[in-house]
């Protein structure tokens, strides 16, 4: 962290207050898996909105974070327009957020966000391993209905939901069902923290160990 701030960042942008920048990076880590709110981020760090925007661009350019853009089609709904923030390394995000023991992760408030961060990272990694940049987005309307990842494979949409829970419950499928009805997507994917992979009506379910199989259907 210190090496990154003091050496790499200074090559990209003139950061005068290194302590504040370190705080900014930590605040970003606690927001992994969330829609970017630059005003809130700036206020928490005591910096201006423009500075927060510039520093976030630095983190993205140095591959510390990835910004997942919103899917552009609204299907008659008002949409969230800001991107979602993901740390490229979920382990680093956990460490910066103060999580030091693997055993404490399961009960930590960030466990779901970190699991989602890991899955999104695996999808992006799968695309890179295939020599292409996958067209990944997220979708959320003003009513709060959200799809964690919407993949565009040519003209085909593949909605993906990510749930950290180990037991499947009906609520896990609600967003996928709604999005498929709005978009006409034929099939959705659910990646969850359990072990069993299976097929449900209109949804392929993958346990976390099968994330590579799921990624092959996305990228």
Where are these predicted regions, by residue range?
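Accessory nucleic acid-recognition modules appended to NTPase machines
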Residues: 1-157
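Switch/connector loops and helix/strand junctions flanking conserved nucleotide-binding motifs
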Residues: 95, 169-170, 197-201
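Arginine/glycine-rich "motif VI" loop of SF2 helicases in the C-terminal RecA-like domain
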Residues: 128-129, 177-186
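Short beta-strand/turn micro-motifs composed of small residues
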Residues: 140, 191-192
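Short beta-strand-loop-alpha-helix junction that forms the active-site gateway
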Residues: 153, 162-170
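Structural signature of nuclease core domains in nucleic-acid processing machines
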Residues: 155, 183, 203-205
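Domain-level recognition of nuclease-like catalytic cores that cleave nucleotide substrates
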Residues: 193-219
């Amino acid at each position: 962290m210190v090496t990154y701030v003091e050496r790499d960042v200074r090559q990209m942008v003139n950061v005068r207050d290194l302590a504040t920048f370190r705080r900014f990076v930590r605040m970003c880590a606690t927001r992994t898996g969330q829609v970017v709110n630059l005003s809130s981020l700036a206020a928490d760090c005591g910096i201006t909105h423009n500075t927060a925007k510039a520093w976030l661009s630095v983190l993205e350019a140095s591959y510390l974070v990835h910004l997942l853009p919103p899917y552009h089609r609204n299907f008659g709904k008002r949409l969230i327009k800001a991107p979602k923030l993901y740390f490229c390394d979920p382990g680093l995000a956990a460490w910066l957020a103060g999580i030091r023991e693997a055993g404490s992760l399961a009960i930590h408030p960030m466990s779901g966000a970190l699991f989602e961060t890991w899955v999104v990272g695996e999808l992006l990694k799968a695309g890179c391993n295939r020599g292409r940049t996958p067209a990944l987005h997220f979708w959320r309307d003003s009513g709060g209905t959200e799809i964690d990842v919407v993949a565009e494979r040519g003209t085909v949409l593949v909605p993906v939901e990510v749930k950290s829970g180990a037991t499947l419950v009906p609520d896990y499928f609600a967003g996928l069902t709604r999005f498929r009805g709005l978009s006409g997507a034929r099939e959705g994917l659910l990646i969850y923290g359990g072990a069993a992979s299976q097929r449900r009506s209109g949804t392929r379910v993958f346990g976390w160990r099968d994330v590579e199989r799921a990624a092959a259907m996305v990228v």
